[in-house]
Amino acid sequence: YFQSGVAVPLFSLYSKQSIGIGEFLDLIPFARWACFCEMNIIQLLPVNDTGAESSPYSARSAFALNPVFINVQSVEGSSEFSDEIREGKLEFDALENIDYYKISTWKRRILRKIYDLNYKSIKKDEVLLGWIESNGWAKAYCVYCTLKAQNGEASWKDWTNYKDPTEKDIEKLWVKYGKDCLFQAWMQCIAEMQFNAAVAEISKLGLRLKGDIPILINEDSADVWAERRYFSLDDRAGAPPDMFSYSGQNWGFPTYRWDVVEKDDFRWWKARLAQASKFYHAYRIDHVLGFFRIWSIPEREVTGIMG
């Protein structure tokens, strides 16, 4: 059975309706083009939240979507800031390259203004509250993002407090910083709705969306911060020396403590794959071999030689 498709990073897929970078809703016109070309599959690079990082493979959450891909004009309440949004679009459209950090910062600022203006109704939104309850990773992620912002985006390892939080700590912080935490959840809820709208159109056209799941996760992430027991912070993953790199590779990501993961019935990985299945008809794990063996390097090493 012959299959044809296209692999594309979402950030490169920007259209006339998007602002400075590809967005979830840009998948809709792209899917129509792919259908016209008689393609079957659209494959994306990871679309998880990377914070200030531009690499899609350096996520700060294995579950959360990247708010930079939200189409702000489609968000309820955005009309109050139409002039500011229009000015931002003109500025970013004039750039030759994607200014990832600037666009990400600008979008979060606009979304925060919309959120603050409509906070009284948003905090009672049953859809949002239901989304929080149905996503077990949400509170830890939202608290992590809130604390990270309060600490000038520094790594959790450099925070003064809450470097190793308990579940009670996370619940307490969720209440203490309720408005800021809810803002993070609200952005995620919007991102999911827009992504789901695009996926629905892709499915309607008879196409399939394929995702990309990096097997590793950034040390400075909500997952490593809140689920520390699953990760070995004394080790870094990489590759041994070969004909392409005499010193090997050190990717800088912690390895898994598979004995702990297994003892917990692979709960975290099951949840991660279930999250991906909400959006993708298929997905690639990069790289699946890492489930069986991986080059592990002592944390203090710079190269991959001593693995």
Predicted regions and their residues:
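Substrate-binding/active-site clefts of carbohydrate-active enzymes
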Residues: 139, 200, 208-267, 272-275, ...
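A structural motif
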Residues: 39, 280-282
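GGW-centered surface loops in extracellular recognition modules
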Residues: 285
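A general structural signal for stabilizing positions within well-ordered secondary structure
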Residues: 33, 274-277
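Acidic/aromatic-lined carbohydrate-recognition and catalytic surfaces
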Residues: 1-227, 261-262
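Short acidic/histidine-rich active-site segments
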Residues: 288
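Surface-exposed, flexible loop/turn segments at secondary-structure boundaries
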Residues: 50-52, 291, 296
